[in-house]
Amino acid sequence: MIDEALFDAEEKMEKAVSVAREDMATIRTGRANPGMFSRIVIDYYGTHTPITQLASINVPEARMVVIKPYEANQLHAIETAIRNSDLGVNPTNDGTIIRVAVPQLTEERRRDLVKQAKHKGEEARVSVRNIRRKAMEELHRIRKDGEAGEDEVARAEKDLDKSTHQYVAQIDELVKHKEGELLEV
């Protein structure tokens, strides 16, 4: 029962770190990156579908992204979705592909993006701590119901704390890395 609670908590913490990693990938750094388009969706025959599933996305140069839709009739919809996104880029459509020039970030925009990265990191840390809290409640319930002894639960609590610190450190490292990318000129 204890192992089950710890395994469940660790699985959820891993998912929280994974979500944080995806969130960090969507923050534009001034360099072209296919991941910056992963959250943009378009209406594809009645279904909201990410652009990454409807087109190949290549980075031929440091500040240029080329998007080639698998179906030519989706070209305009993809272009419109990119233009309406919060990326701050202006796509150009040449009839077969979409080119997206990634502009240099201003100092003010860099600082805003660093704040955004720190905010997303804090959300992930809170998520990990909430998972820890729920797992601790489960461990206390196990102890109270007599399903496990004091020593076993105490050992499990130490393991849970160790895992929590490990995952929070991973999130901190993600934020630090993204901050370094953003402030690099």
From Swiss-Prot:
Where primarily located?
cytoplasm
Q: Transmembrane region positions?
A: none
Instruction: Give the start-end ranges of region Disordered.
Output: 143-163
State a GO cellular component annotated for this protein.
cytoplasm
| Described purpose of this protein according to its UniProt entry | Responsible for the release of ribosomes from messenger RNA at the termination of protein biosynthesis. May increase the efficiency of translation by recycling ribosomes from one round of translation to another.
Family in the record: Belongs to the RRF family.
Name-wise, this protein is: Ribosome-recycling factor
The organism encoding this protein is Mycobacterium marinum (strain ATCC BAA-535 / M)
Gene that this polypeptide is encoded by: frr
